Amino acid sequence: VSGRKKIIEFKNVTFKYTRCQEPTLKNVSFDIYEGEKVLIAGSSGSGKSTISYCLNGLIPHMYEGEMSGEILIDGERPCEMKLHELSGKISTILQDQDAQFIGLTVKEDVAFVMENRNIPLKDMNLSVAEALEKVDMEAFQNSNPHEISGGQKQRVSLAGVLASKSGILLFDEPLANLDPASGENAMKLLSEIHKKYNKTVVIIEHRIEEVLSEKFDRVLVVSKGEIIANGTPQEILLSGVLVSAGLREPHYIRLMKLVGCNLNEYHNLDSPSVVKEASAQEKIHNFLARRVIKRESDEEREYALEVQNLTFSYGERLIFHDLNFSIKKGEIVTLLGANGVGKSTLSSVITGFLRHSRGEIKILGEDISNASIKKRGELIGYVMQNPNLMITKNSVFDEVAYGLKNKKVAKQEIVERVHQLLKICGLYGYRNWPISALSFGQKKRVTIASILVLNPMVLILDEPTAGQDYKHYLEFMGFISKISKMGIGILFITHDMHLALEYGDKSIVLYDTSIIAESTPTRVLMNCDIVKKASLREHSLSNISKLLNISSLELTERYLAEEGRQYE
């Protein structure tokens, strides 16, 4: 950064939201230089999103509170600037895209910033077309942005940023609603923009492995409102600070530790290719010689959910045709596939929000195809992808207790059950908080807790780990594993390949109206053809296997067995 201008400056910044007793940011200081690409990483509730609100003016213009210290954006104080002036310096993609859309069509939304700057129509149309082409959304330019899939919404938001001329690009969890392949492409695109236009890029994320697939100048680690580490990716990965901050280390780093590598001996830890070094190769080959103890499966378990010959269309558009799959009692199944393939639509059909044209849906052997939504709701718990669409109460406790109160459960039992769930979901300390003060990930856990407290027979969760950091992921999945052992069949609609490998008993891949794979997660996710078709992402263990010319199945099975699948 020698000779570069400071473009972002935080000087001893402390901030406390009006409704909170304790500050969310505590004496935060850091500088970001012009043209840098910086990752700000932290667990849910760490304060990383609050830093982004300070940068883009949402604090103090939208979120009120008490602030001390100084923030400078290109030498100016954002708190003294009008929002339209600040947006000329820094452009933001929010985590919740629905809260960001302005236009009635995708094209209008991307053009909005240029309309405000009086760009000539001819130039505007050209810029919009170029931006949509870069994110592969040209075919959706006349679509309603609120009616496309979550990943497509993310790409529209990205197109809007690309159409702006801001020098600083701020991304708040850009991978949250993208399928793995789209996420990988998005990170590559951000790198291209950074290099080609010398933009200052700041990314707020907790998905360390996925984000660090591209090069970064620096990583700032936030924990409990403080910056606990500030260094290069190499320095951060070597320090071990990610684990203490509640974040997941990249799998190849965990593998190297598992086989006994001394990380201090390696100088390119920010790339999986580090495993090609001779000492690492030798240790990994020795590791493969160890015996694997395989889990025993109970093939005699009763089916919790059966889907037979299921067909559904939106008008003349066929979404899926003759789907057949089942979930046994206590089985955890992950449904994988690209954005827009119909995963969330399938859950809506199963729960009765949409009616299928042909086929049967059975719960514990009973056909519920003609059952009401209320009847299905007694058997199936459904957690939506966007928590803001499910929240109806002001406080955390009241939201989780709402369903039990409707069922006339005794007051003391409600308190006991809600408190138990909140402790397991890592929310007990927030039980009396207003939900509006929570982070996106915390809101997600509130909605999940409000469903789990009702003890459904089948549980469907749409992107349950979106917005969840590694610490809360482990806590939540530990609880889900306990629920599965009680005999509840669980279906995860997810892009999280880590979840599928670490917790799934079976993975189903939906592609082009059909199921193209149904097997163990290892066999599905280590199959490169399936991964490519389903817009998934090659797992780092598969990449390592290619680098070392070893079996990806063998390496993954041994790795998972040695790490210990957390529900065992």
Predicted regions and their residues:
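The feature captures the beta-strand-to-loop junction immediately N-terminal to the Walker
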Residues: 41-43, 336-338
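Conserved ABC ATPase "signature" region
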Residues: 122-140, 412-430
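Helix-to-loop junction immediately C-terminal to a conserved catalytic motif
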Residues: 56, 351
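Conserved ABC transporter NBD signature motif
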Residues: 64-76, 359-367
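Catalytic Walker B motif of ABC-type/P-loop ATPase nucleotide-binding domains
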Residues: 169-172, 459-462
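Conserved beta-strand-loop-alpha-helix hinge in the C-terminal portion
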Residues: 226-252, 514-541
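Conserved ABC ATPase signature
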Residues: 144-148, 152, 434-438
